Amino acid sequence: MTTTLLDGGEGHRYEEHAGDWGGLPPGASLREIADVVVDPHGRVHVLTRGEHGILVFEQDGEFLYAWGEGIFQRPHGATLGGDGTLWCVDDDGHGIYQCSLDGKVLRTIGTPGQAAAAMSGKPFNKPTKLAVHPDTGDLFITDGYGNA
């Protein structure tokens, strides 16, 4: 395995790992990755469009666990909330999910599987991403494909 370290300045480091990073459970792959989030414990949560919606790794690539089977139709974005929960956006499923880091769905926003009329401005028609305000916890959701 070859590792290339790039110095991005101002204390930012970028490492490129060539080779086999992360052993995977049966049926999982690192293709069609929609987003990636690092939690406060340094674990890497990879949002995929495969059988397992979320693959969780240690920073060194050691596979820990997977979750999300049957939740998402087509995951599109993930955001770590200030409370340590993971927000997942499902564009084809037209829903937003707030989840614990071990995969329990805590809250759903929108009606999964039901799209608002295109260009109606009503939520949701293929949402794409979510941001959480660090001070207030307010959610900002882009409804980017069917309501853009």
Regions picked out by a protein language model, each given a short descriptive name:
Residues 1-148:
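Eukaryotic scaffold repeat domains enriched in small/polar residues
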